[in-house]
């Protein structure tokens, strides 16, 4: 299972250290004004879906 953050313009940023890192990156994105960032998960790294 892979976790990441989907940004509205640049796409998915994969988080190599798991769910906690993805949560922190989403929090920082929201803090700096990127309110559309969302947590996503993938089994194969190609098809991402929102959590």
Curated annotation (Swiss-Prot):
Domain of life, per lineage: Viruses
Annotated protein name in UniProt: Gene 62 protein
Natural source organism: Mycobacterium phage L5
